């Protein structure tokens, strides 16, 4: 048994572009209470997001049966917000950019605080947008909706009977 031979545009469905719906949404909900003022806080969220990405289907492994629900992270609406969320956590070496690191000016310190606040605000905004999309079912697949949206057909092979 296998999926029909995919076209190149269907190969993306076999990659680590999924997240298990309930654990992922729970992680997003829990993350909303963080301030993300430290790089370690932003790194922790980024790591949680990246470790949530899984592959649930392959050419020879069918999408899990109901009641399994997975978020397709390459869905155009989800991907835009998810990518923005990942980018907003990546502020390492950009929070403090100074000419002379041994003599940081007050203006440079204030700029670093603003960048940290901007990153934290962006993370919170992206978390809320992503939760809103997921609550509305955007990019959420079960087996039936996955096979319909992807155009992949599960082929059941039968073995010929011998007399």
Swiss-Prot record:
Chief location category: virion
Keyword Transcription regulation belongs to the record: no
N-acetylalanine modifications at: 2
Gene Ontology molecular function: any one: structural molecule activity
InterPro entries: TMV-like_coat, TMV-like_coat_sf
Subcellular localization: Virion
Keywords (A to Z) from UniProt: Acetylation, Capsid protein, Helical capsid protein, Virion
Cellular component GO terms held in the UniProt record: helical viral capsid
Biological role stated in the UniProt entry: Capsid protein self-assembles to form rod-shaped virions about 18 nm in diameter with a central canal enclosing the viral genomic RNA.
Family: Belongs to the virgaviridae capsid protein family.
Protein name: Capsid protein
Gene name tied to this protein: CP
């Amino acid at each position: 048994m296998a999926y029909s031979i995919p076209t190149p545009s269907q190969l993306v469905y076999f990659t680590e572009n999924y997240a298990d719906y309930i654990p992922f949404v729970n992680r997003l909900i829990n993350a909303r209470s963080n301030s993300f003022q430290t790089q370690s806080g932003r790194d922790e969220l980024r790591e949680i997001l990246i470790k949530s990405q899984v592959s649930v289907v392959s050419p020879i492994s069918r999408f899990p049966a109901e009641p399994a629900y997975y978020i397709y992270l390459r869905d155009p609406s989800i991907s835009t917000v998810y990518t923005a969320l990942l980018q907003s956590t990546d502020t390492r070496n950009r929070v403090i950019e100074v000419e002379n690191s041994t003599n940081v000016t007050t203006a440079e310190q204030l700029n670093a605080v603003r960048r940290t606040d901007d990153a934290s605000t962006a993370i919170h905004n992206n978390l809320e947008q992503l939760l809103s999309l997921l609550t509305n079912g955007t990019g959420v697949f079960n087996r039936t909706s996955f096979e319909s949206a992807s155009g992949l057909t599960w082929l059941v092979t039968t073995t010929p009977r011998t007399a």
